[in-house]
């Protein structure tokens, strides 16, 4: 199990889906080291489980301003890494 602490900064998403996002991101961080690969893994998993089209941004330093579908947005930290996941389109 990972020692990364999940801190949800902002969410418009069901509790169940939020937990799924954290679990999925934890798996991605255990599997990959490159941020682009981590983001791709999370995006593809959410496309499969919750239907397209999901977008995922992973990094330590970024700003964002996005439009998302209602109840399909989460921004959280897993350890030092920020993850923005949202559905749009």
Swiss-Prot record:
Gene Ontology CC: one annotated term: centriole
A Pfam family reported for this protein in Swiss-Prot or TrEMBL: Dynein_light
Coiled coil: none
SUPFAM superfamilies in the cross-refs: DLC
Compartments in which it is found: Cytoplasm, Cytoskeleton
This protein's record includes keyword Transport: yes
Phenotypic effect of disruption: Flies exhibit defects in bristle and wing development.
Aminoacyl-tRNA synthetase in keyword set: no
GO molecular function: disordered domain specific binding; dynein intermediate chain binding; dynein light intermediate chain binding; protein homodimerization activity; transcription corepressor activity
Tissue/organ expression: Ubiquitous.
Keywords noted in UniProt: Cytoplasm, Cytoskeleton, Dynein, Microtubule, Motor protein, Transport
InterPro entries: DLC_sf, Dynein_light_1/2_CS, Dynein_light_chain_typ-1/2
A GO biological-process term: spermatid nucleus elongation
Alphabetized PROSITE patterns for the sequence: DYNEIN_LIGHT_1
Top-rank taxon, per record: Eukaryota
Function: Acts as a non-catalytic accessory component of a dynein complex.
Membership in a protein family: Belongs to the dynein light chain family.
Assembly and binders: Interacts with spn-F. Forms ternary complexes with spn-F and IKKepsilon.
Name of the featured protein: Dynein light chain 1, cytoplasmic
Organism in which the protein naturally occurs: Drosophila melanogaster (Fruit fly)
Species classification: Eukaryota, Metazoa, Ecdysozoa, Arthropoda, Hexapoda
Gene: ctp
């Amino acid at each position: 199990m990972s020692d990364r602490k999940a801190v949800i900064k902002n969410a418009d998403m069901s509790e169940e889906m939020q937990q799924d996002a954290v679990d999925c991101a934890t798996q991605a961080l255990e599997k990959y080291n490159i941020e682009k690969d981590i983001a791709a893994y999370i995006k593809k998993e959410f496309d499969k489980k919750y239907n397209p089209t999901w977008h995922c941004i992973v990094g330590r330093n970024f700003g964002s301003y996005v439009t998302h579908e209602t109840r399909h947005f989460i921004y959280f930290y897993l350890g030092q890494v920020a993850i923005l996941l949202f559905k749009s389109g």
